[in-house]
Amino acid sequence: IMIIGEAPGANEDKQGEPFVGRGGKLLDDMLKMIGLDRSRLYITNSVKCRPPENRDPMNTEKDACKGYLQRQRALMQPKIIVCLGRVSAMEIIRPDFKISQEHGQFFEKDGCLMMALYHPAALLRDPRKKPETFEDLKRLQGNGTLFAHKTARKGLVIPAGHVPAQVPV
């Protein structure tokens, strides 16, 4: 699993590692709740440099970092990519991605299964989104991921909440 965020925040910029601030702590806690350990995942950002004043990355910044992200993906060869936030999802899944409508859905692209979740910073700003994000995360574990791998087709969307309790192997 490869997790791709948007861009470094102040803490990440200081420490040179993604998701180390409050958002990183929340991400770690959420991953633990579904039995995933951060040390077994590859976590990066689509933009490698911190945009001033925490603004969304500009197209020129995204374009400047595209090659780095492509090389990371080529080296890691992830089976699953989780985009954290709108900016990452629009960069990785498709430019018109709507995080409020499409979070938690699996998409197949370039032989890789992809899903977008609300960014941890968005969850800190609006804690009411945490339960639905946790439900989205649960789809990454166990039968949900197995089901998605078996049924995803190029361009096919598997809606959130559409995972049977048991999937025969």
What feature does the model see in each segment?
Residues 1-169:
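A polyanion-binding, active-site-adjacent surface
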